[in-house]
Design a protein with these regions (language model features):
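C-terminal coupling/interaction segments
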Residues: 253-300
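Short, flexible helix/strand-to-coil boundary loops that buttress conserved ligand/catalytic motifs
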Residues: 69, 215-218, 235, 265, ...
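ABC transporter nucleotide-binding domains
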Residues: 2-4, 9-195, 199-201, 207
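Short loop/turn segments at beta->alpha junctions
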Residues: 89, 210, 276-279
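ABC transporter nucleotide-binding domain
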Residues: 165-256
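Short, surface-exposed beta-strand/loop "edge" segments at domain boundaries and coil↔beta transitions
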Residues: 148-149, 153, 228-231, 259-262
Length: 300
């Protein structure tokens, strides 16, 4: 488990992280969402031990990360900008990583290069942005570390390669102790892969929750209730996060159990009612607006 304990990081007068508190459980995929400048990259660098926080600390399985090689051996950090030696090939980077990470699997790396169609002898600097990202991810996977910190991993990948990387992550979780932490400015990028999602804004985590719990607890309903008084009663009786109306069609996002929500709607004798699936984006918009934030100005 990664424990982030009241972490504050400053750059001069700028407070990039402000008392961040979070827990990242083992064998889950943690998504860290937020706009550019929200503090995602800084937080990943603090977790990896690249940056030292002014206050607080990060622990990996109970071990403080800062200046602790034993803790750092448990993780690998993939930055948002791919970093390779000048004129390096994938083979050369493989040999370098093998020295740094004792558990690096060279044979697996060679196999994955072939699967992804990457020439091991071609200079990486001649690769496209997406191809460089692929090499970075494959190197990170093959370190066999327990934790993989990924900063904008899917940025620059086409849809096919994005799905291939997601499948690779899922395979690793099934076959060994593996916990990826994926930072992204796009909720859509992480919705279909992450188990747990945290929203970072202005250096602090607004909230962090299991994705399944969010979707079980919040519902989107569209209904037509001919009696205006009963419609008003419905809005008062439910925990409404958002509502809008077009003509006679009422759209409501509410918190509560699906059975209870359905029961209250049917009591109002609707002409039509339907519970619709919610996207992660819609859930976050509803949650943050209740907290006093306009997420439309924070993300997307």
């Amino acid at each position: 488990m990664i424990s982030i304990e009241q972490v504050t990081k400053e750059f001069g007068d700028i407070r990039a992280l402000d008392q961040v508190e979070a827990q990242i459980s083992e064998n889950s995929i943690f998504g860290l969402a937020g706009t550019n400048g929200a503090g995602k990259s800084t937080l990943l660098r603090v977790i990896s031990g690249v940056l030292r926080p002014e206050k607080g600390q990060v622990k990996i399985d109970g071990l403080p990360v800062w200046e602790n090689p034993a803790a750092k051996r448990r993780l690998c950090f993939i930055p948002d900008t791919s970093c390779f030696f000048p004129n390096a090939t994938s083979e050369m980077m493989r040999d370098y990583y093998r020295v740094i990470y004792p558990g690096f699997d060279s044979g697996r790396f060679d196999e994955l290069l072939e699967q992804f169609g990457l020439d091991p002898r071609r200079k990486i600097q001649t690769f496209s942005k997406g191809m460089k990202k692929q090499v970075s991810v494959l190197l990170g996977i093959c370190t066999n570390t327990e934790y993989l910190l990924c900063d904008e991993t899917f940025d620059g990948l086409d849809p096919v390669m994005r799905q291939a990387v997601k499948s690779l992550f899922a395979s690793e979780i099934l076959n060994r102790k593996f916990t990826p932490v994926i930072a992204s400015h796009s909720l859509r990028e992480i919705e279909d892969i992450c188990d747990h999602v945290g929203l970072l804004h202005r250096g602090g985590i607004l909230f962090s929750r299991e994705l399944d719990d969010m979707k079980l607890d919040i519902h989107k309903i569209q209904c037509v209730i001919p009696d205006p008084l009963k419609e008003e009663e419905l809005l008062c009786e439910m925990e409404v996060l958002q509502h809008s109306k077009r003509g006679s069609l009422l759209t409501v996002i509410v918190r509560g159990s699906e059975e209870e929500v359905e029961r209250k709607i049917m009591e109002k004798q609707p002409l039509f009612s339907e519970i619709l699936p919610l996207s992660l984006e819609e859930i976050f918009i509803s949650e943050t607006e209740v907290a006093g934030y306009d997420i439309k100005n924070l993300i997307f």
